[in-house]
Swiss-Prot record:
GO cellular component assignments: plasma membrane
Membrane topology: Multi-pass membrane protein
NCBIfam families (UniProt xref): ispZ, PRK00259.1-2, PRK00259.1-3, PRK00259.1-4
Keywords linked to the UniProt accession: Cell inner membrane, Cell membrane, Membrane, Transmembrane, Transmembrane helix
Family: Belongs to the YciB family.
PANTHER family listed in its UniProt record: INNER MEMBRANE-SPANNING PROTEIN YCIB, INTRACELLULAR SEPTATION PROTEIN A-RELATED
Subcellular location: Cell inner membrane
Job description of the protein: Plays a role in cell envelope biogenesis, maintenance of cell envelope integrity and membrane homeostasis.
Record InterPro entries: YciB
Listed name of the protein: Inner membrane-spanning protein YciB
Stretches that traverse the bilayer: 22-42, 50-70, 76-96, 121-141, 149-169
Domain of life: Bacteria
Length: 178
């Protein structure tokens, strides 16, 4: 249910874009994301940090997009979110000396320290790749291509990378947990 709640504002963004334009779609995205945060708080009595960061960036960059009537702001939001995620993973790994992925999943999954580190770095690199790919698609290809990429391409890439991560985790789990 939570994944659907996170994905719903993106679907609203896409549908409104197809019916109107990117500015109407951006306004709808802001409203849909705010409603998703409110619903999450009402239903679960908590909002994930990642969801809150995403909402703040949607509100700020979406607001700038509408105010200046310039779609570049909302296009940059994707890259900035991925840069923040990658930065958080790398800071956790190198400064705090503990992979953030391990902090998030370590209660459910047991892996050797080197596997956590590699998985953490792999996700950081994935986020960097997605951020750079977004820059290319957003600023070198037509807006409609970027919209399809944002709604279908990035989630598709994330799904594939999540499945590959699952295979990696399975291969490094202790035998008794498999």
């Amino acid at each position: 249910m939570k994944q659907l709640l996170d994905f719903l504002p993106l679907i609203v963004f896409f549908v409104v874009y197809k019916l109107h334009d990117i500015f109407w779609a951006t306004a709808a995205l802001i409203v849909a994301t705010a409603l998703a945060v409110i619903y999450s708080w009402y239903k679960y009595r908590k909002v994930e940090k990642m969801t809150l960061v995403t909402f703040v960036l949607v509100a700020v960059f979406g607001g700038l997009t509408i105010y200046f009537h310039n779609a570049e702001f909302i296009k940059w939001k994707v890259t900035i979110i991925y840069a923040l995620f990658a930065g958080a993973l790398l800071i956790g790994q190198w400064v705090m000396k503990k992979p953030l992925i391990q902090s998030m999943l370590g209660k459910e999954i047991t892996l050797p320290a080197h596997a956590w580190s590699r998985l953490n770095i792999a996700w950081a690199l994935f986020f960097i790749f997605c951020g750079l790919l977004n820059i290319y698609v957003a600023f070198w290809l037509p807006e409609a291509v970027w919209m399809n990429f944002k709604v279908f391409g990035i989630p598709g890439l994330t799904l594939v990378f999540t499945l590959l991560s699952g295979v990696y985790i399975y291969r490094h789990m202790p035998q008794e947990e498999k």
